[in-house]
Amino acid sequence: MNLLLVSKGFYTVYAVAKSREHCELLEFLGGVDQTLQKDSDRMLALLGRVAMEGPPRNTEISHQIKGKLFEFIQGRLRVLWFYDERRLIICTGGFVKKGRKTPRREIDHAFRLMDDYFEDKKKAQIQIYGEEGV
């Protein structure tokens, strides 16, 4: 699995990436329409704050979805994520929430990526982009 460094501080925030140039989360946040641009900017700022301070305890900004899966919230934008040891936060992707419930396919996709991450971690097959020396 490939990870791209999003922000680093007391916590380290990564996003799942297909390659150094292709990160679903950053492409999503950079490609939202004009009406959601402020929310996208706020989400990127939130990810920076999370790296410095840890995930917010305010459930209007971050809360548990199911099991070990959480979501960050900014307006209608959502970013799903999970923890790993040593204060790592792995973001699996983002989407625009259109209804009351988080879409099942987004949750399933995030759980698949989480399973892949921990499986690849056991095999020492995690490639990290964006850190010095990589």
Label every PLM stretch briefly.
Residues 1-76, 86-89, 96-134:
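Basic, Lys/Arg-enriched alpha-helical interface segments
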